[in-house]
A protein has these predicted regions:
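Catalytic-core regions built around general acid/base machinery
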Residues: 285-290, 405-412
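Short proline/glycine-enriched turn/loop motifs at strand-loop junctions of beta-rich domains
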Residues: 108-115
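Intrinsically disordered, polybasic Lys/Arg-rich low-complexity tracts
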Residues: 1-47
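Substrate-binding/active-site clefts of carbohydrate-active enzymes
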Residues: 178, 196, 200-208, 213, ...
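Short alpha-helical segments and helix-capping/turn motifs at coil-helix boundaries
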Residues: 100-103, 234-236, 406-409
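Active-site region of glycoside hydrolase catalytic domains
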Residues: 216, 401, 408-415
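The feature marks proteins involved in alpha-glucan
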Residues: 32-100, 104, 125-215, 220-225, ...
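Conserved aromatic beta-strand anchor motif in extracellular beta-sandwich/beta-rich domains
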Residues: 117-119
Length: 415
């Protein structure tokens, strides 16, 4: 037997040696390098299966999720020519912006036939001077105004028209929304204070070993029987958090919402910090103060659904109820009385990923706790599901688009 094994071994060595010899003569044989590249890019989930053999029956599903995310990443970044963070810059383009000379306003409303800005500056009437123009070949609208056309603090909305209807709407990308104390009506607000907040703590790095999180609600987390403010939280609650040894706060209900009883989870304006608690500058000061005291700040971000309100929210921005949301049976959440985002649309990904980048860069949040993840991942929204074994997580009823979105959001800073 030993002799046969030796012979077989020599024979095998000869078979391996032959292509090596040929490779020195033929440059084409260098294609073997491509095999090494492929091996190096094997998806990380292979390691998941090796670490947990119970996942082996679902390896195909895991591969599929990985491949879907890689495919979408390549599509959005032009096969790596750009970064994912470059794609997530909608907040720098859409919305109302002060320029060196004048103002510019842009909105994504492909179903609209006409858009006006109405507000304090034109007595809330349609005015040709404040009429937007559709950018040719797109669903985007644009309005350029002179320096004196708008002033800080003025209230405004869009007057949107579409085939068969019209309505007043708060712009999807607006950064400041306020509610009238008497009428209770919400409006967008021109926000361009003379003095902007400058962060004093630069390049803050959270302590993670371990991360001790204090979950809090700015409005409800204080002793007084009223809606608390960013400043009151900074002055009264943050010192107790520091004293008790926490190194992170998880802040609930920051995005603007019409109904306070929702705790902030029926969001209407995704780029506007809730004005109930104060100004954007006061929120920045709260976060900066936390950082100066070694406290990281995580934001509860709501991308699992949106409020149904049409005037305040995205429910029917320009006559198309499905502009941001799934059509048909998946349009409304069966338990939350809200609308479900269509994560399969690139424009919706653009909106949500830009929203993530906006909060990270503009307010220096250190990260997110994504709300309602189970609701996003499964067609059932997790309702009536026991999730008693791995099979329940890979039952074929998952929303691959939502999984892809969360994957991209989690990788955005590194891509």
């Amino acid at each position: 037997m030993a002799k046969k094994e030796t012979t077989a071994k020599k024979s095998a060595e000869k078979k391996v040696a032959a292509p090596k010899k040929a490779a020195t003569k033929k440059p084409a044989a260098k294609k073997v390098v491509a095999k090494r590249i492929v091996d190096q890019t094997e998806p990380e989930h292979i390691g998941l299966v090796k670490n947990d053999s119970w996942l082996e029956p679902f390896e195909g599903a895991i591969r599929g999720r990985h491949d879907h995310a890689v495919w979408k990443l390549n599509q959005l970044t032009q096969n790596g020519k750009k970064k994912l963070s470059d794609f997530a810059t909608g907040h720098l383009y859409f919305g109302l912006h002060k320029l060196a000379k004048g103002w510019v306003f842009r909105e994504w409303a492909p179903n609209a036939t006409d858009i006006y800005l109405i507000g304090d500056f034109n007595n809330w009437q349609e005015d040709e001077k404040y009429r937007c123009k559709r950018i040719e070949g797109t669903g985007n609208w644009e309005l350029k105004l002179s320096e004196k056309a708008l002033k800080h603090g003025q209230l405004y909305k869009m007057k949107v028209k579409w085939n068969g209807g019209e309505g007043e709407r708060i712009p999807a990308w607006c950064r400041r929304v306020v509610q009238d104390d008497n009428t209770k009506i919400f409006s967008a607000q021109v926000w361009n204070p003379e003095k902007t907040y400058e962060f004093q703590k630069k390049n803050f790095k959270p302590k993670k070993n371990p991360l001790l999180i204090y979950e809090c609600h700015v409005g409800m987390g204080q002793d007084a029987e009223k809606v608390g403010t960013y400043t009151e939280f900074k002055d009264n609650v943050l010192p107790r958090v520091i004293k008790d040894g926490y190194n992170c706060i998880q802040v609930m209900a920051i995005q603007e919402h019409p109904y306070y009883g929702s705790f902030g989870y029926h969001v209407s304006s995704f780029f506007a910090p809730s004005s109930r608690f104060g100004t954007p500058e006061e929120l920045k000061e709260l976060i900066d103060t936390a950082h100066k005291n070694g406290i990281a700040v995580i934001m509860d971000i709501v991308h699992s659904h949106a409020v149904k309100n049409e005037v305040e929210g995205l429910g029917n921005l320009a006559g198309d109820p499905n502009q941001f949301f799934y059509p048909g049976d998946r349009h409304e959440h069966p338990a939350w009385d809200s609308l479900c985002f269509d994560y399969g649309k690139d424009d919706v990904l653009h909106f949500l990923l830009s929203n993530c980048k906006y909060w990270l860069e503009e307010f220096k949040f250190d990260g997110f706790r994504f709300d309602g993840v189970t609701s996003m991942l499964y067609y059932s929204h997790g309702l009536g599901e026991a999730f008693g074994g791995y099979g329940d997580y890979f039952n074929g009823h998952e929303d691959d688009n939502a999984i892809c979105y969360l994957t991209l959001a989690n990788r955005m800073r590194s891509c």
